[in-house]
Every structure is written in structure tokens, then in C-alpha cells.
């Protein structure tokens, strides 16, 4: 009997141990649950880094925006992401195209529909024309509307106040007092400075600047003002005085024109060696003049060396990555970080600079450029950004630059 009782007790203990073993199973299933929130937190932080790193280094290497169609047909006839162009052509190889590339890349990567809208009347578009384009985008199903250029301001203030459920990204913009508008600006003076410094170090002594917007476009003014400062800094280091012709003529509409090409040709024929073409489609006229005179060009906004062998470098700003970053603020539920918040992207965001992938300068090296860029980032080199109009350059006190305003 005692043996039977002992056997029963032994079995009870075995079952108890088995029972203890089965209670351990839920503990094993609970571990992934405690880890999952940590896994979801990482993507939530990534958008803050994307504009300075990921879009610039990874996406261009794997996806070419030119391989993505400019137009698409959505299944429901609605388009979630819209782009309203600035004056000039959509495919201007510069400001409009760079911004739209950001729209296309983000939409394609995330399976979203997109569409571009061009205000009526081309380079003669009015604020009403721009508003109509924004209204069409909002009524066409847009959740995010990207508007390029400072001229969009008046129309955008009206459209955003009317379509409060739609988010608007204002590239080259400023605060409008509306939480559904994210203004994104750039430190173009830094990029212009780098370009001016580089070409003088390369040996150019007779330079030109042709700007768009008639001297009223803040971004173009900053480019030009920074360019003149960079030219002066390099000339001072080299102990030389250089010539800088400076003009806003024929660029008010940012378009190519026979008049602009004739003026650029005249500059080249009279000794100008290189012109900073700062104004969208104006680039085509200046390149044509440079090609005819065996001269050189500095591109703007994007790397324009792909368009012509006359381009020795380009003053860049990160239109593609900034556009993707701003759109993602909506889709990552982080709009509060940018809505009615003044955002200026510069060297410290890796948002301005010169293209090193297509470097063609021989006397001014990539290493020297990177050292100069680092000096801007750490504050050793300070660039004035107070340019309001072309007169600021004339009166800037640039001791080693002779400015000829035309």
C-alpha cells in the first residue's frame, strides 16, 4: 500500500512539474510583445534624418526620377500628392523639375497617386491662376499639395485657409500663420558662396551672374549675394582683383529668350569667362551662348553638368530630399513639426553644396571644397544672408571684386 501511495505521490509531482512547464509558455509568447513597440519606434524617428542622409545617398543610386512617369492614372481618379509648378517649364532641369522629382520619388516608393498642376497663362500667370491650380489639386483628392516658388505665397494663403484638411508644402516659402502650411527655405547664400569661391580658385577672373525674378526673388538674391562673397574671399586669399558682371535683365519670368542669349553672348565675346545661370529655364539661353563662345557656366539648384559640357559646377540645394522629407511629415503623423514652422535647410543639414560626383575642377580639389564646407558648418566661415535686392551686392564692400551692374 505504501508503495502504491509513493507511486501516486510521484505521479502528482510529475504532473505538477508539467503544469509548471506549461505556465512558462505564455512567458515566451509575451517577449515579442514587449519588443514590438521598440521595433515600431525606430521608423518613427527616421524621417527626421531622411532629408540630410537617406534621400540624398540611397534613393538616387537605386531609383532615377526620370524613369518615373510624369503623369499617371489612378484607379479612383483621385490623386493624393499634388505638385503646383512655379513659373517656367515643368522640365526646366532646375527648380520645378527638382521639386517634382521629390514628389514622384516619394509617391512611387510608397505606392501613392500623384499629379502635377500648372497654373494657366504660363509665365504670365496671376495669383488667381495659381489659386485655381491649388483648388483643382485639393478638389482632385490631394492630401498634400507641394507648391514651388515664392510667387505662390498670396494664392497659397487663400487656398490653405479654404482647404483646411489639406496639407501644403511651400518650397522657398515662409510662415503664413496657417498650421496646414509647411514653409521650407534654403540657405542659398552658402551654396552661392561655395560656387564663387571654387571658380575663382580654379583660375576664373572675369565672371558673370544672371539672376531670375528681376531682383525680387529672395532665393536668387541669396544665391547672387553669396556668390559675390565667395568670389571676393577667394580673390582676397589669392591677392588678386576679379571682375563680376551682375544682371537681372531678361530673367523676370525665368524663361529662356533670344534677348537673354544675346546679352550672355555679348558678355562672353567681351571677355567674361563664366556665368552663374541662376533662374530656371534661363539656363538654356546662357548655355547656348557659352557653347557658341567656348565659355563656361555655373548651374543652379541641381547638378546641371548632365545637360551641357559647358557646366563646370552647380550651386545645389536639396530640393528632392527636402520635398520627400516634408511630404513624409504628413504620412508619418509628424506634421506638427513643420506646420507653420520656419524651416531653413543649409550646410548643417547637407542641403546645400557643390556636386562632388561629377567634379571637373582641377586646381580646386574636392578635399579643399570639403574643408571649406566644414568651415561653414562649424561657423568659422560666416556668410551674410541679408541680401534684399541686387543693390546689396553693389554696396557689399567687396574689396577684391569689381562689380559691373548691368
PLM features per residue range, with description:
Residues 1-11:
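Positively charged n-region of N-terminal signal peptides that target proteins for export
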Residues 16-19:
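C-terminal motif of bacterial Sec signal peptides marking the signal peptidase cleavage site
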Residues 22, 28-35, 39-406:
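A residue-level marker of the well-folded mature domains of exported/periplasmic proteins
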Amino acid at each position: 500500500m505504501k508503495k502504491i501511495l509513493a507511486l501516486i505521490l510521484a505521479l502528482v509531482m510529475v504532473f505538477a512539474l508539467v503544469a509548471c512547464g506549461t505556465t512558462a509558455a505564455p512567458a515566451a509568447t509575451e517577449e515579442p510583445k514587449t519588443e514590438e513597440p521598440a521595433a515600431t519606434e525606430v521608423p518613427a524617428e527616421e524621417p527626421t534624418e531622411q532629408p540630410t542622409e537617406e534621400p540624398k545617398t540611397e534613393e538616387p543610386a537605386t531609383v532615377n526620377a526620370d524613369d518615373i512617369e510624369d503623369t499617371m492614372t489612378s484607379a479612383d481618379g483621385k490623386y493624393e500628392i499634388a505638385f503646383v509648378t512655379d513659373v517656367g517649364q515643368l522640365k526646366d532641369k532646375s527648380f520645378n523639375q527638382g521639386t517634382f522629382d521629390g514628389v514622384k520619388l516619394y509617391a512611387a516608393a510608397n505606392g501613392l497617386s500623384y499629379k502635377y498642376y500648372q497654373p494657366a497663362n504660363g509665365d504670365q500667370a496671376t495669383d488667381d491662376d495659381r489659386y485655381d491650380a491649388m483648388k483643382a489639386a485639393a478638389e482632385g483628392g490631394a492630401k498634400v499639395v507641394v507648391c514651388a516658388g515664392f510667387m505662390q505665397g498670396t494664392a497659397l494663403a487663400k487656398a490653405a485657409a479654404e482647404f483646411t484638411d489639406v496639407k501644403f508644402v511651400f518650397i522657398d516659402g515662409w510662415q503664413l500663420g496657417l498650421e496646414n502650411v509647411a514653409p521650407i527655405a534654403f540657405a542659398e547664400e552658402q551654396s552661392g558662396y561655395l560656387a564663387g569661391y571654387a571658380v575663382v580658385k580654379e583660375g576664373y577672373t572675369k565672371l558673370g551672374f544672371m539672376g531670375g525674378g528681376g531682383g525680387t526673388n529672395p532665393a536668387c538674391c541669396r544665391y547672387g549675394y553669396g556668390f559675390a562673397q565667395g568670389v571676393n574671399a577667394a580673390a582676397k586669399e589669392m591677392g588678386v582683383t576679379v571682375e563680376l558682371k551682375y544682371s537681372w535683365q531678361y530673367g523676370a519670368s525665368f524663361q529662356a529668350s533670344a534677348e537673354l542669349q544675346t546679352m550672355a553672348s555679348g558678355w562672353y565675346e567681351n571677355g567674361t569667362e563664366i556665368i552663374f545661370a541662376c533662374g530656371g529655364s534661363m539656363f538654356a539661353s546662357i548655355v547656348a551662348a557659352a557653347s557658341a563662345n567656348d565659355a563656361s557656366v555655373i548651374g543652379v539648384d541641381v547638378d546641371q553638368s548632365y545637360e551641357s559640357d559647358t557646366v563646370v559646377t552647380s550651386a545645389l540645394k536639396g530640393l528632392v530630399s527636402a520635398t520627400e522629407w516634408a511630404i513624409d511629415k504628413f504620412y508619418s503623423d509628424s506634421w506638427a513639426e513643420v506646420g507653420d514652422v520656419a524651416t531653413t535647410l543649409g550646410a548643417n543639414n547637407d542641403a546645400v553644396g557643390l556636386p562632388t560626383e561629377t567634379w571637373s575642377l582641377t586646381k580646386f580639389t574636392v578635399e579643399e571644397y570639403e574643408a571649406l564646407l566644414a568651415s561653414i558648418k562649424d561657423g568659422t566661415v560666416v556668410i551674410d544672408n541679408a541680401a534684399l535686392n541686387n543693390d546689396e551686392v553693389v554696396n557689399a564692400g567687396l574689396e577684391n571684386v569689381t562689380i559691373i551692374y548691368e
